[in-house]
Amino acid sequence: MIQRDIEYSGQFSKDVKLAQKRHKDMNKLKYLMTLLINNTLPLPAVYKDHPLQSSWKGYRDAHVEPDWILIYKLTDKLLRFERTGTHAALFG
């Protein structure tokens, strides 16, 4: 099993607090994060995991819910949770 360092951006922490305030089911986010931490790849198709482009090149996007996404970066040595939120909040 690959062992990676795990990082959380400062903005990710703020995004999580906002999701909690909006009464999102945080267990869904935690489960997706656990899959990534445990290197359960590829992710199940329900998460619609895909690479991002443009200014987010090098990052990936997985859907917690249809309009709630997790942006993360995965390398051989690092798993970085960058952002979470709606498409409009993150890309709009």
Swiss-Prot record:
Active site location: H87 (proton donor)
Pfam families: YafQ_toxin
One Gene Ontology molecular-function label: RNA binding
Keyword vocabulary terms for this entry: DNA-binding, Endonuclease, Hydrolase, Nuclease, Repressor, RNA-binding, Toxin-antitoxin system, Transcription, Transcription regulation
Any one GO BP annotation for this protein: translational termination
Class in the EC hierarchy, top level: hydrolase
Domain of life: Bacteria
Entries under InterPro entries matching the protein: RelE/ParE_toxin, RelE/ParE_toxin_dom_sf, Toxin_YafQ-like
Documented EC number(s): 3.1.-.-
Described function: Toxic component of a type II toxin-antitoxin (TA) system. A sequence-specific mRNA endoribonuclease that inhibits translation elongation and induces bacterial stasis. Cleavage occurs between the second and third residue of the Lys codon followed by a G or A (5'AAA(G/A)3'), is reading-frame dependent and occurs within the 5' end of most mRNAs. Ribosome-binding confers the sequence specificity and reading frame-dependence. The YafQ-DinJ heterotetramer binds the consensus sequence 5'-TTTGAGCTACA-3' in the dinJ promoter; DinJ also binds DNA but not as well as the YafQ-DinJ complex.
Family affiliation: Belongs to the RelE toxin family. YafQ subfamily.
Subunit structure: Monomer in solution, forms a heterotetramer with antitoxin DinJ, with 2 YafQ-DinJ dimers associated via the N-terminus of the DinJ antitoxins (YafQ-(DinJ)2-YafQ).
Name of the molecule in the record: mRNA interferase toxin YafQ
UniProt gene name: yafQ
